């Protein structure tokens, strides 16, 4: 059986990157929540 996680930098950035998070209202909510929590890294 093939492993499920096959890393790819491109796909990682396109699906979980900062700019993608900024696009939608929900994504911005995620970033704000992470800021409030004091996360060092907001997005990938």
UniProtKB/Swiss-Prot annotation:
GO cellular component: ribonucleoprotein complex; ribosome
Name of protein: Large ribosomal subunit protein bL34
Any one biological process term the GO annotation gives: translation
Gene Ontology molecular function: structural constituent of ribosome
Lipid metabolism recorded as keyword: no
Keywords (A to Z) from UniProt: Ribonucleoprotein, Ribosomal protein
NCBIfam families: rpmH_bact
PANTHER family registered for this protein in UniProt: LARGE RIBOSOMAL SUBUNIT PROTEIN BL34M, MITOCHONDRIAL RIBOSOMAL PROTEIN 34 FAMILY MEMBER
Family listed: Belongs to the bacterial ribosomal protein bL34 family.
InterPro entries for this protein: Ribosomal_bL34, Ribosomal_bL34_CS
